[in-house]
Amino acid sequence: MTEHSLWRFSRALHRAINERQREDLEALIDEEVDWAIYGPIDMFPFFGARRGQAAVLEVIRQIAEKIRVHRFDRESIMLGAESAASMMRYSLTALDANKPISLRLAQFARFKADRLISIRILIDTFDLVEQALGQPIRLPKIVS
């Protein structure tokens, strides 16, 4: 049995972020890839939807300028022949403030001929924003 496309993509993505080695990653991303990271775009401009390999590689370059990945744990994963879904926990450092950040995310990826054709990443943004701001978010009290 051959290695699932998710494993190759995951390794190449982390090398692209931490070591700025995008060559391996470029070969694993389809020219017409459909990419979206759901979260507060005003705070994190690299969130949002992108289309095409060049746009995705630019987003990854922007992410690499802002964070370093220290650790990631797959909490659960489901693999199909050309798809993958996973819940993950990441330990990162925000490079501008040298600040540790922990976050959870869910990702849903589709592959064709071993290349990423679509990915959706949903981030626990409430927790992420609190960590980025360095304080809890004050919510209005709900009166019943």
Task: Tell me the role of every PLM-derived stretch.
Residues 7, 54-57, 103:
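Short, well-ordered alpha-helical segments
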Residues 1-31, 137-144:
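Short, low-complexity N-terminal intrinsically disordered segments enriched in polar/charged residues
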Residues 13, 25, 33, 52, ...:
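Hydrophobic pocket/interface hotspot
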Residues 24, 30-81:
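A solvent-exposed, acidic/Ser-Thr-rich amphipathic alpha-helical stretch
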Residues 1-5, 64-144:
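A beta-strand edge to alpha-helix "cap/lid" segment located at domain peripheries
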